[in-house]
C-alpha cells in the first residue's frame, strides 16, 4: 500500500480508544488526531466567551475559528467541558465546520484518528476501521481514575451516570450518531489492559494491511 494509510478508530467515551490510537500512531509512524478534542476545544472557546455551547450560532462561530493551538490547552478535560462538548457535538453546522479540518489533517501523510464518526462520516474509505468499546462499568472506572489523577473526585456513581447520559446522547443525536461502521472490526477492551488492547489492535491492523 503506497498511498498514505488512514486508520479510523471509533467508540464510546472511556473505551480506551484514545490510548490505543496514540500507540498505533507511534507503531505505524503516523500522525495522530483525537477528534473529540476538537469538540472540547470549541466548547472551551464558547464557555470562555460566556456563550451557551448548545447555541448553534455561537458554537459554529468558534468551530470556524479553531486553530491547532486551541488543541494544546490544558483545560479541555474537565467535567464542565465534557458536558459542553456533548452539546457542541450535536450541532450539525459545527460538525460540518470541523469535517474539513479532520480530512486535511490526514490528507498528506495519512493518520490515525479516533472519535465517534471517523469510520462512518469523516473517512468512510479508511484503510482500517476499528470500533473500540467496553462495558459501562469498566469505562466508568477508567474515567473515575482519570479524574482522581487530576485531583477531581466526583464519585464513581456520578461518573457512571455522566457516561450513560453521554452514551445516550451520542447514539441518538441526529448529526452523525455513534454507530459501528459495517466494515469496522470490533474490539471489546472490557477484559483487557492497555498493552493487551494494543497488541490485539495492532494484529488486526496488520492483517487488514497485509490483504492490501
Curated annotation (Swiss-Prot):
Binding site for ATP: 11-19
SUPFAM superfamilies membership: P-loop containing nucleoside triphosphate hydrolases
GO cellular component, one term: cytoplasm
UniProt-listed GO biological process terms: pyrimidine nucleotide metabolic process
Region annotated Disordered, chain positions: 50-69
Record-linked InterPro entries: Cytidylate_kin, Cytidylate_kinase_dom, P-loop_NTPase
Pfam families, alphabetized: Cytidylate_kin
Gene3D superfamilies: P-loop containing nucleotide triphosphate hydrolases
Record keywords, A-Z: ATP-binding, Cytoplasm, Kinase, Nucleotide-binding, Transferase
Subcellular location: Cytoplasm
Recorded superkingdom: Bacteria
Entry's EC annotation: 2.7.4.25
Keyword Cytoplasm: yes
MF terms in GO: ATP binding; CMP kinase activity; dCMP kinase activity
NCBIfam families named in the record: cmk
UniProt family annotation: Belongs to the cytidylate kinase family. Type 1 subfamily.
Protein name as annotated: Cytidylate kinase
Protein source organism: Acidiphilium cryptum (strain JF-5)
Encoding gene per record: cmk
Amino acid at each position: 500500500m503506497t498511498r498514505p494509510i488512514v486508520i479510523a478508530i471509533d467508540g464510546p467515551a472511556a473505551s480506551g480508544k484514545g490510548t490505543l490510537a496514540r500507540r498505533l500512531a507511534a507503531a505505524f509512524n503516523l500522525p495522530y488526531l483525537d477528534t473529540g478534542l476538537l469538540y472540547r476545544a470549541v466548547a472551551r472557546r464558547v464557555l470562555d466567551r460566556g456563550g451557551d455551547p448548545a447555541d448553534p450560532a455561537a458554537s459554529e462561530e468558534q468551530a470556524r475559528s479553531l486553530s491547532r493551538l486551541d488543541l494544546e490547552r490544558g483545560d479541555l478535560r474537565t467535567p464542565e467541558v465534557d458536558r459542553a462538548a456533548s452539546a457542541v457535538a450535536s450541532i450539525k453546522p459545527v460538525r460540518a465546520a470541523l469535517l474539513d479540518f479532520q480530512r486535511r489533517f490526514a490528507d498528506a501523510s495519512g493518520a490515525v484518528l479516533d472519535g465517534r464518526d471517523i469510520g462512518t462520516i469523516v473517512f468512510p474509505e479508511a484503510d482500517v476501521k476499528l470500533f473500540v468499546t467496553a462495558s459501562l462499568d469498566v469505562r466508568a472506572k477508567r474515567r473515575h481514575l482519570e479524574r482522581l489523577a487530576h485531583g477531581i473526585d466526583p464519585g464513581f456513581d456520578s461518573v457512571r451516570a455522566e457516561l450513560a447520559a453521554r452514551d445516550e446522547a451520542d447514539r441518538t443525536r441526529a448529526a452523525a450518531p455513534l454507530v459501528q461502521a459495517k466494515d469496522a472490526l470490533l474490539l471489546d477492551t472490557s477484559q483487557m489492559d492497555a498493552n493487551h488492547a494494543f497488541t490485539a489492535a495492532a494484529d488486526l491492523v496488520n492483517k487488514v494491511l497485509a490483504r492490501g
